[in-house]
């Protein structure tokens, strides 16, 4: 063979390798999601915001059981099967075998998932003597607010592949509770290694999970980069890489979507919905939200400890005007905490009408005829249940001024807002909720129980025995009709006591590029990309 032919062959080989490399890079599929904010951290046990869950529990972690995407149906997760004892107090889970852990520069796993990981994940939240209990602030708002420290007597390892939960009483929604984000399973081996290294906080900042995506890089307020986890036990993701492009402004998110700089965006401006419907490059998905937007009154602070004052502030607000201006009619005025699409909804409850004169009369009866001043906290981010908190706050401020109540609007960065609100610094604070498991208990107990008042997710800090005497028995019985009746009564009590101004249930819109296939709107408000492809 001549030298020239050799060179020609080498050139062809080189060109072939280049072509293969280019082809591989073209085939590598990346999806960009224009997320609305930065996560508070990467351990879903410690936080309650959907922003954090989208970045942590959804892509990185798994739970013993999961919700089938797009539904509230509970399906096997890390547990492939389970049994419940006849008395409803013992749950036995049989773990999948061969489930791999992710790795990072600090940790290379030496074993698969086992029962030790499950026990550790719950013991950290329950046991104040666990060396990880106080790491990263040690705030387990969901676990504590749902009363789980008292409900769960023991989580014990039966063998390497079997775990048992022993409860102090039957709990109807317990299985669905275990599909929630706070119940994500963390690696005990990773935790032990980081504890020995003197860096336990890395477990919460540099996550190791068993989920479909693995964290590669996080730049606060800029982007989060993930890759598909090659060792994932489930169906492999159809995309190779996923980028969260952190974009707080909804108008900017929409502009990026139009330019194909991202392919999916959450929480569009209501004013942009009509344009999105006409955009031939965008598919606008929608469904009634399993959510509620509300304003909590801190009942530990005067004069909000007086039910007449709370009722007055509620009568004074024109909710229909808010639905038109803030939600652009993409929602409905709320009279109950749970949305009308949820079982147990009490449609017989009569909503507070817009009645400034009635509000003035109630203030007079409360000895506040001349009015008073109050702070009104407005969240700094868009949420599915509140597309424009600042505008809503301004409208409430104007309505209250008409009855002599002067409101000062207050806001903070989202993480700081939640931290201060949990500490009870506010008088009134805008909040909201998207259901986590399809059960009314997830609204009533998580947001307004006495346990939640103590542990932070009850921002009204309202602990009312007649209400508690309805929602607690409803949790304990497996008689569905009995639960419905108890929750209907609870809605009447809550309406009369007005611990919060219940404002709206929104319609949820999800604009996605036409190139995106397989994306499903989640009724629980999460954003799942493990079954999504980009053409």
Label every model-predicted segment:
Residues 201-204, 229-275, 393:
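Ligand-site clamp/hinge motif
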Residues 68-69, 150, 160-161, 171-237, ...:
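Gly/Pro-rich hinge or "lid" segments in bacterial periplasmic/extracellular proteins
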Residues 34-86, 123, 208-210:
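N-terminal lobe/hinge region of extracytoplasmic solute-binding protein
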Residues 213, 333-366, 383-391:
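Structural transition elements
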Residues 38-54, 78-79, 105-108, 172-184, ...:
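A structural "hinge/loop" feature
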Residues 2, 94, 127, 131-191:
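Surface-exposed binding/hinge segments that line
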Residues 30-31, 35, 55, 172, ...:
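Detector for C-terminal structural segments
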């Amino acid at each position: 063979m001549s030298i020239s032919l050799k060179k020609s062959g080498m050139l062809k080989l080189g060109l072939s390798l280049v072509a293969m490399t280019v082809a591989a890079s073209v085939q590598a599929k990346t999806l960009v999601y224009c997320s609305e904010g930065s996560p508070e951290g990467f351990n879903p046990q410690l936080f309650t915001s959907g922003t954090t869950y989208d970045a942590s529990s959804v892509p990185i972690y798994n739970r013993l059981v999961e919700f089938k995407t797009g539904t509230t149906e509970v399906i096997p997760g890390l547990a492939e099967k389970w049994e419940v004892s006849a008395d409803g107090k013992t749950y036995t889970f049989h773990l999948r075998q061969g489930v791999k852990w992710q790795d990072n520069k600090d940790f290379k796993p030496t074993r698969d998932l086992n029962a030790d990981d499950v026990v550790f994940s719950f013991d950290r939240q329950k046991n104040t003597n666990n060396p990880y209990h106080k790491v990263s602030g040690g705030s387990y708002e969901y676990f504590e607010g749902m009363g789980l420290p008292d409900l769960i007597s023991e989580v014990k390892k039966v063998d390497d592949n079997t775990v048992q939960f022993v409860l102090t009483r039957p709990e109807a929604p317990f299985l669905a509770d275990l599909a929630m984000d706070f119940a994500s399973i963390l690696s005990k081996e990773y935790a032990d290694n980081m504890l020995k290294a003197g860096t336990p906080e890395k477990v919460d900042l540099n996550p190791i999970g068993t989920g479909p995506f693995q964290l590669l890089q996080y730049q606060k307020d800029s982007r989060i980069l993930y890759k598909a986890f090659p060792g994932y036990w489930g169906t492999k993701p159809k995309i190779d890489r996923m980028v969260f492009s952190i974009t707080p402004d909804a108008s900017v998110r929409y502009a990026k979507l139009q330019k194909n700089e991202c392919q999916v965006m959450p929480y569009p401006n209501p004013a942009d919905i009509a344009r999105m419907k006409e955009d031939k490059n965008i598919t606008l998905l929608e469904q009634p939200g399993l959510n509620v937007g509300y304003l909590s009154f801190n009942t530990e602070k005067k004069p909000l400890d007086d039910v007449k004052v709370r009722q007055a502030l509620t009568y004074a607000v024109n909710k229909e005007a808010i639905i038109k201006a803030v939600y652009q009619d993409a929602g409905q005025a709320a009279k109950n905490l749970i949305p009308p699409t949820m079982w147990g909804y009490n449609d017989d409850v009569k909503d507070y009408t817009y009645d400034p004169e009635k509000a003035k009369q109630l203030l007079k009866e409360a000895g506040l005829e001349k009015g008073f001043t109050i702070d009104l906290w407005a969240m700094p981010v868009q949420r599915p249940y509140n597309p424009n908190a600042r505008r809503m706050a301004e409208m409430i401020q104007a309505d209250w001024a008409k009855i002599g109540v002067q409101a000062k609007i207050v806001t903070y960065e989202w993480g700081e807002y939640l931290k201060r609100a949990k500490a009870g610094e506010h008088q009134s604070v805008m909040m909201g909720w998207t259901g986590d498991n399809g059960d009314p208990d997830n609204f009533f107990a998580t947001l307004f129980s006495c346990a939640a008042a103590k542990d932070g997710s009850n921002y009204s800090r309202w602990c009312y025995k007649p209400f508690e005497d309805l929602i607690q028995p409803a949790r304990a019985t497996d008689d569905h009709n009995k639960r419905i009746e108890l929750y209907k009564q609870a809605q009447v009590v809550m309406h009369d006591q007005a611990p919060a101004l219940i404002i709206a249930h929104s319609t949820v819109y999800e604009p996605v590029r036409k190139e995106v296939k397989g994306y499903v709107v989640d009724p629980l408000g999460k954003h799942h990309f493990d079954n999504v492809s980009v053409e």
